[in-house]
Curated annotation (Swiss-Prot):
Its main location: membrane. This is NADH-quinone oxidoreductase subunit K. The gene is nuoK. GO terms for molecular function: NADH:ubiquinone reductase (non-electrogenic) activity; quinone binding. It is an enzyme of class 7 (translocase). It is found in: Cell inner membrane. Pfam families: Oxidored_q2 (PF00420). NDH-1 is composed of 14 different subunits. Subunits NuoA, H, J, K, L, M, N constitute the membrane sector of the complex. GO terms for biological process: ATP synthesis coupled electron transport.
Amino acid sequence: MTLTLAHYLILGAILFAIGIFGIFLNRRNLIILLMSIELVLLAVNMNFVAFSSWFGDIAGQVFVFFILTVAAAEAAIGLAILVLLFRNLNTINVDELDRLKG
């Protein structure tokens, strides 16, 4: 059995749906929110790679590197905010972010 474009797109859609479901289901925990956003970005990246491989164009695969760079920066900033939130308020609840002033 060979994997076709449809297999990759279905897997990407499932990952995307799980990520969106995680964002809407849990809006309080910052760690789960960041993981869900990363899962959505992973699904989009997988679709880019699948389409670029299917059409024989390398532009989609190059674009994935830019998305991964932005995702790494987003994860680093998100984790820095998480550490700051936990140090100051002893919680990782997103609703408590407005209590940080400075």
